[in-house]
A protein has these predicted regions:
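Auxiliary, metal-adjacent structural segments of Zn-dependent hydrolase domains
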Residues: 13-88
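Solvent-exposed loop/turn segments at secondary-structure junctions
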Residues: 79-80, 96-98, 112, 120-121, ...
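Post-HEXXH active-site segment of zinc metalloproteases
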Residues: 100, 116-142
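Long, well-structured alpha-helical subdomains associated
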Residues: 137, 149-206
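Extracytoplasmic/secreted envelope proteins and their assembly/folding machinery
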Residues: 45, 104-107, 141, 145-148
Length: 206
């Protein structure tokens, strides 16, 4: 059974499941494969439309080779997680809805896909000590969360709903650190580093 089939088996949703594509732009290759019900496809389409409002996220999706893009699903059985990425499948939990919060979750999980595809650490994970493995995992999580910060900052002025999602995220230390660096006009790598450090400063998370 494929990973995406396993994910679908965990969705616990009613309705006929189909496989198709979900578009995020007008380009020939601006799409992901997906599986789910008509309701799931409608949700994924709405989420990706919001993700694509960020030029950085749009570029990131377009730059990902077609062969490396994960299949998308909406998970209905999760209560303790907003989503996950497992290389061949990226799942967004139904509990996140279809608004900018859900789009930020996608940005987070898609950053994990970028880590799988482009990250050198994955190639040498077998040689890591336990301490190194834990550190690598937490750095990866900090980078993924900062991708969500970057997304929310990019779209915050688009409409009131985006502004609300951004303001809610400011409760997070990492979001505040990233936003402050952006307002200061720092380079994007420095903004990302600030966001990651802000995330790591929260001892409950890192």
């Amino acid at each position: 059974m494929s990973t995406i089939e396993q994910a679908l088996n965990q969705t616990n949703g009613a309705g006929k499941v189909r496989r198709d594509i979900v578009r995020f732009g007008d380009g020939e290759n601006d799409y992901f494969t997906a599986a789910g019900t008509d309701e799931d496809f409608a949700a994924l389409t709405e989420i990706l439309a919001k993700v694509a409002e960020s030029p950085e996220q749009l570029k990131k999706m377009r730059d990902m080779p077609m062969s490396e893009r994960p299949g998308l699903v909406i998970s209905k059985g999760e209560r303790s997680s907003y989503g996950y990425c497992a290389k061949t499948v990226l799942s967004i939990s139904k509990i996140t809805g279809t608004g900018y919060k859900a789009a930020a979750v996608f940005a987070h999980e898609f950053q994990h896909q970028c880590q799988y595809v482009y990250g050198n650490a994955q190639r040498f994970a077998h040689a890591f000590s336990l301490k190194e493995s834990i550190l690598e995992e937490r750095i990866g999580e900090a980078a993924a969360e900062t991708a969500a910060y970057q997304y929310l900052y990019d779209v915050k002025d688009n409409n009131p709903q985006a502004q609300t999602a951004y303001k809610a995220a400011l409760e997070k230390r990492g979001m505040r650190a990233y936003a402050l660096a952006r307002r200061k006009g720092e380079s994007e790598p420095d903004c990302v580093l600030a966001g990651m450090q802000g995330y790591a400063d929260n001892l409950r998370l890192a």
